[in-house]
Design a protein with these regions (language model features):
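Alpha-helical transmembrane segments and their immediate juxtamembrane cytosolic regions
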Residues: 1-343
Length: 343
């Protein structure tokens, strides 16, 4: 039986997201918007598209790796993926508390993180990844049903936007924040972002490429975001924490552009191999870049970088992390291709 080749386009798509996210983190930790005001013009669009983009890519890959197969064959792999992302949250969250907050390495520091009662900064998204894959596992049967019925899936995605109107102020339990959001601290609630998971499934299921209907829908969604943004008295961005319907809808056109760009890049493999490598090892790059950035900020608190220097820092960090993958990965394994989820 022939082995299905890995979909390189979605790896490139994820690689673009990683490239943007790590650059954004470098700017946030080592730049100053007062001194380098242009940095915020990069941070805002990267913030807009990144988490939604990862949710989309997760839905896309899960459709190929899991929902196209019987539950009995894949449930343990989904659990393993969720466990990996949870461990990544534990490591990143602990590193943030130790390096950035200068907390002591004690049980009182680590225990709340392990129990999901503490969501350290720049690590919450990893907890949300865990919730996302667990939600995808718990809803395996209905999601598989929706994936086979395009219009039902699109309707469900639209209806999920209504969850952005829930009373966030009534939610105070920390473990609920990655699921449904809160106003108490920054979080990435997977229920509100779940429309992108469904869209990712549908794109994978129906092999969506360029489609005028998709382009029009994405343009309307992003246009609504732009209208809300620019029509405000102070022209401030729509609410991100917790996400408003405008914020969730906002990146649609940009992400569709990323998606089409990645499909074009797929036709020219050699120049974009580094992006593919980022996309195949998303979780490792996000985790290790966080740990290295936290450690560097702790060691170099006065370091101040402009846009170009922050980019060089990002490339250095990604090179170090890529080297760590290269020295522990066997060539035969590197050559093997699969559609399994790697976050």
């Amino acid at each position: 039986m022939a082995v299905r080749q890995r979909e390189r386009a979605i790896d490139i798509f994820k690689g673009l997201l990683v490239l943007g996210m790590v650059y954004c983190h470098c700017l946030q930790f080592f730049s100053d918007p007062v001194i380098f005001p242009q940095g915020q013009k990069w941070i805002d669009p990267i913030n807009l598209i990144t988490f939604s983009g990862f949710v989309f890519s997760f839905g896309y890959v899960c459709q190929l790796a899991y929902y196209s197969k019987p539950f009995a064959e894949v449930w343990h792999r989904m659990l393993a993926t969720a466990f990996k992302t949870l461990l990544a949250f534990y490591i990143s969250g602990t590193a943030y508390r130790l390096f950035i907050d200068q907390r002591p390495l004690e049980w009182t520091t680590i225990k709340p993180i392990l129990l999901l009662n503490d969501m350290p900064g720049w690590s919450e998204f990893l907890a949300s990844f865990t919730y996302l894959i667990l939600l995808g596992l718990l809803l395996f049967v209905p999601l598989k049903w929706l994936g086979r019925r395009k219009w039902a899936g699109l309707t469900a995605a639209g209806l999920l936007l209504l969850t952005t109107f829930m009373p966030y102020g009534a939610i105070h339990a920390v473990p609920w924040a990655p699921l449904v959001g809160t106003r108490d601290f920054a979080s990435f609630p997977v229920v509100q972002y779940f429309p992108y998971y469904l869209l990712g499934m549908l794109f994978a299921r129906y092999r969506t490429g360029f489609d005028w209907r998709v382009l029009a829908g994405a343009a309307i969604a992003t246009g609504a975001f732009a209208w809300k943004w620019l029509s405000g008295a102070d022209a401030s961005l729509p609410e991100r924490f917790p996400p408003s319907v405008w914020w969730v809808a906002g990146p649609a056109l940009l992400l569709y552009g990323y998606y089409l760009l990645s499909r074009w890049m797929e036709k020219y493999p050699l120049p974009f191999l580094p992006l593919e490598a980022l996309g195949r090892n998303v979780l490792w790059f996000l985790l290790m870049s966080n740990v290295l950035i936290f450690a560097l900020k702790s060691n170099q608190p006065l370091l101040l970088l402009g846009l170009l220097d922050a980019f060089w820092m990002e490339l250095g960090l990604l090179a170090v992390i890529g080297f760590s993958i290269w020295i522990i990965t066997k060539p035969a394994r590197r050559a093997a291709l699969s559609n399994d989820t790697k976050m």
